UniProtKB/Swiss-Prot annotation:
InterPro entries according to UniProt: Helicase_ATP-bd (IPR014001), Helicase_C-like (IPR001650), P-loop_NTPase (IPR027417), SEC_C_motif (IPR004027), SecA (IPR000185), SecA_DEAD (IPR011115), SecA_motor_DEAD (IPR014018), SecA_preprotein_X-link_dom (IPR011130)
Cofactor, how bound (note): May bind 1 zinc ion per subunit.
The protein's name in its UniProt record: Protein translocase subunit SecA
Subunit note: Monomer and homodimer. Part of the essential Sec protein translocation apparatus which comprises SecA, SecYEG and auxiliary proteins SecDF-YajC and YidC.
Organism: Campylobacter curvus (strain 525.92)
């Protein structure tokens, strides 16, 4: 009550923020006549003068903001024939301050972005503008590029499929770079797999504006960016697990309100949390079918994992809802955009389980070579901002995860769209009949209708019903996306009927003419509520742009997934009380609120899932940053490795003494020097005379052995120029580092897969994950030190000319393996396509130059079996 009175007197927090911006907008407006009076050359000169002062540090961005915004507005009037509205100036200031600007559909977000983009590009440190697809990135870079070029700023775009380093470098070196979230993220990962600093394409992460920020930072947050390579694991387990899963019977969960109630059947599905629980009866049955005594023994861990994924594939994932089968492949359907996610695969074996279910070719599992999340990638920028039409529903998450405020920007013209209360029916059949009747009424009077569906399957059901009703219409879904722009552009024509999945929620504006305005504008019909209120709001937002009339209404049924799983009991009770007959519906604000509460429940669950993912990735992210920082040091031509090599050599010798059971304080007569010398020879090919070490104390052996190895190494390297020596050391160190990091990521994957089971032992899985991942990282560092010393000691040099050729060839081979042998894949919190790497024949000379066969040298120290496997 008190807060309501406070808001009435002082306005909301958003209102108070807007008032501050309005004062500044008034001042910017006073500058308009000054810049209008200038000719083109004078306007450019005024901008360049401001730009020079910013670059020299004489003026800060805040000090030049008013003039720069006024200049950009004037330049836009001349070049683009568009003048920034006052509310667009407010949006520009919000973005410049590193906040999220929530702007309704049709309010010109693309034009708004030009203001902070130009302002921040003046520093010369680069500005990135992120869009949801290549088409929008190219379109915006081309259209807005005319304005940027007029002001002397360079603009470029990074597109998928164009991976030439020189092309990418040119794009990132431009003042302004457009591209998609996945391309920016993958370029970051690719850069940290390069063997020469000059091949890196990205520069510092200065300022980024994310268009459709809710889609990228919220919806895509559960999608890790992963570069992956092949594994040698067999695929037979997926087929067997699929056969077993189909023989198990689905049951009901135990009723918490009934004492001693037990779950029935072989397994229980929790649709709310999207999990499967196998009952005792199910475990016994599965063990018989697999022919094992204990399904949950360590040696059967892979079997139980395959079975879990097979049960998920059959009971939680629907064809034409969560995925489609296209060209004999399982392709994911993005639940938020409705588009096909080509090249993306579910991980942890789920995609293979779906392939087994659909009887298509099962592709190999993959191993992580490099990964990050969008949360951690975008948090690297010094300043992050975003814009979207729908952000307030996720304001808490933006604040907690990204430290971003959401500011709702007033519309330039009041919204005239009428949003009607939901209509709720008992069954889906009744609901769809009512939808068809409503479409028919609107079509007969000429009012265009856009019908939103939550899945491909539902869009095709409606399509068949409209065909029977003889109502002409267009269908837009992931199976028919090629004509998307044309279908959406025509959706506002008189009498048009368009059925669309969530694809219609963003991107292209639907324009209407005066005749359609007189008929009430575009009519939006939603056939069910999405789990996220934002997706519903995006659908509604297709109507009523820039003050146009329009109308929206959602038709629901108690059989819809959202109501069935999360909230129908209360609504069903109301319908029963009111005695609703077949074909009748409820329309009340109370029911609409109940539906929104169900959506809030789901949003809360998803938020917790994303937060959970981030908590785990934050652990890995600290390790990732440490490794990448060290990698950058190695790539620095001025970095001298001599001290690091000497330190590692001493630690390596101490490790060898431990392995030979030569301990500090032991009796020197008991030391097995012969065994120690054999270990050294097997490890790094160095022959040590036993007599040099016999009769010495522990400290003396440590010092003597370190001295011998150092002396031999220095003698070997003395024939090289200092720069050659440094290059060889760095190349070998990078090779060891990348192999060790790759193996570490594999072990981290295994750890993450099984860590949830610790909860059954009354232990917090996250705390356990932090402890064990730290131990794995300590092992990684130790392995890195010892393996690097081994590699350096094993190097056998030829003549200087031969060595130069060998070093150059080796660098080229290593980079080829990264560039050609890898595929860059996103995977959805869950596997990426199998990747082919160039393989060195086992009996070929080792590329490190040791003179040994590959199988006896680096091939022997390749990825080992994970410690938790």
């Amino acid at each position: 009550m008190v807060s309501a009175i406070f808001r009435k007197i002082f306005g909301t927090k958003n209102d108070r923020e807007i008032k501050k911006y309005v004062k500044r907008v008034k001042f910017i407006n006073t500058l308009e006549p000054k810049y209008e009076a200038m000719n083109d050359e004078e306007l450019k000169a005024a901008f360049n003068e401001l730009r020079a002062k910013v670059k020299e540090g004489v003026l800060g961005l805040e000090e030049v903001l008013n003039d720069v915004f006024a200049v950009v507005r004037e330049a836009s009037k001349r070049v683009l024939k568009m003048r920034h509205f006052d509310v667009q100036l407010i949006g520009g200031m919000v973005l410049h301050e590193g906040r999220i600007a929530e702007m309704k559909t049709g309010e010109g977000k693309t034009l708004v972005a030009t203001l902070p983009v130009v302002l921040n590009a003046m520093s010369g440190k680069g500005v990135h503008v992120v869009t949801v697809n290549d088409y929008l990135a190219k379109r915006d870079a081309t259209q807005m590029g005319e304005l940027y070029n007029f002001l002397g700023l360079s603009v470029d775009v990074v597109l998928s499929g164009v991976y030439d380093d020189s092309v990418r470098q040119a794009a990132y070196n431009a003042d302004i770079t457009y591209g998609t979230n996945s391309e920016f993220g993958f370029d970051y990962l690719r850069d940290n797999m390069k063997f020469d600093a000059k091949d890196k394409v990205q520069r510092e992460h200065n300022f980024v504006i994310v268009d459709e920020v809710d889609s990228i930072l919220i919806d895509e947050a559960r999608t890790p960016l992963i570069i992956s390579g092949p594994t040698n694991r067999t695929l037979d387990g997926y087929i067997k697990a699929d056969e077993v899963a189909q023989k198990l019977t689905r049951g009901e969960a135990a009723d918490p309100n009934v004492p001693n109630s037990k779950a029935t059947g072989d397994f229980v599905v929790d649709e709310k949390n999207r999990t499967i629980m196998i009952t005792e009866a199910g475990i016994s049955k599965a063990e018989k079918l697999f022919g094992v005594e204990n399904l949950y023994n360590l040696e059967n861990a892979i079997l139980s994992h395959h079975l879990d994924q097979a049960l998920k594939a059959h009971n939680l994932f629907e064809r034409d809802v969560h995925y489609v089968v296209k060209n004999n492949e399982v392709v994911i359907v993005d639940e938020f955009t409705g588009r096909l996610s080509e090249g993306r695969r579910f991980s942890e074996g789920l995609h293979q389980a779906l392939e087994a279910k659909e009887k298509v070719k099962i592709q190999e599992e993959s191993q992580t070579l490099a990964d990050t999340t969008y949360q951690n990638y975008f948090r690297m920028y010094k300043k992050l901002a975003g814009m979207t039409g729908t952000a307030q529903t996720e304001a808490t998450e933006f604040s907690q995860i990204y430290k971003l405020d959401v500011i709702s920007i007033p519309t330039n013209v009041p919204v005239m769209r009428i949003d009607k209360n939901d209509l709720i029916y008992k069954t889906q059949a009744e609901k769809f009949k009512a939808v068809i009747d409503e479409i028919k009424r609107s079509h007969e009077k000429g009012q265009p209708v856009l019908v939103g569906t939550a899945s491909i399957e539902r869009s095709e059901v409606l399509h068949e019903m409209l065909v029977k009703a003889k109502i002409p219409h267009s269908v837009l879904n992931a199976k028919n996306h090629e004509k998307e722009a044309q279908i959406i552009a025509d959706a506002g024509a008189k009498g048009a009927v368009t059925i669309a999945t969530n694809m219609a929620g963003r991107g292209v504006d639907i324009r209407i003419d005066d005749e359609v305005r007189a008929l009430g504008g575009l009519y939006i019909i939603g056939t069910e509520r999405h789990e996220s209120r934002r997706i519903d709001n995006q659908l509604r937002g297709r109507a009523g742009r820039q003050g146009d009339p329009g109308m929206s209404r959602f038709y629901l049924s108690l059989e819809d997934n959202l109501l069935r799983i999360f909230g129908s009991d209360r609504i069903k009770a109301i319908m029963d009380r009111l005695g609703i007959d077949e074909g009748e519906s409820i329309e009340s604000r109370m029911v609409t609120r109940a539906v929104e509460n169900a959506q809030k429940k789901v949003e809360s669950l998803h938020f917790e899932a994303r937060k959970h993912l981030l908590e785990y990735d934050d652990v890995a992210n600290e390790q990732r940053k440490t490794i990448y920082k060290y990698r950058d040091e190695l790539l620095d031509k001025e970095y001298d490795m001599s001290e690091k090599i000497a330190q590692n050599r001493g630690e390596y010798v101490a490790l060898l003494l431990d392995q030979a059971e030569i301990f500090h304080g032991g009796l020197k007569d008991d030391y097995d020097i012969k065994n120690l010398c054999a270990l050294i020879f097997n490890d790094c090919g160095e022959e040590i005379n036993e007599s040099e070490l016999k009769g010495l104390e522990y400290d003396e052996i440590l010092a003597k052995l370190t001295e011998i190895l150092a002396k031999r190494y220095d003698e070997k390297m003395s024939v090289l120029e200092p720069t050659q020596k440094r290059d060889i050391e760095k190349v070998l160190y990078l090779q060891v580092l990348d192999n060790a990091w790759r193996e570490h990521l594999y072990q981290m994957d295994i750890l993450k897969t099984g860590i949830g089971l610790r909860g059954y032992n009354q232990k917090d899985p996250l705390i356990e994950y932090k402890k064990e991942s730290y131990n794995l990282f300590v092992e990684l560092v130790s392995r890195l030190k010892s393996e690097s010393v081994k590699m350096l000691q094993m190097v056998r040099l030829r003549s200087r000319e031969e060595q130069e050729r060998e070093t150059a060839a080796m660098l080229e081979r290593m980079q080829e393996q990264q560039d050609e042998g890898l595929k860059f894949n996103q995977r959805e919190g869950e596997d990426a396509p199998a990747v082919r790497e160039k393989k060195i024949p086992r009996n070929s000379p080792c590329p490190c130059g040791s003179g040994k066969k590959y199988k006896d040298c680096c091939g022997k120290s390749g990825p080992k079996k994970g410690i938790l496997a």
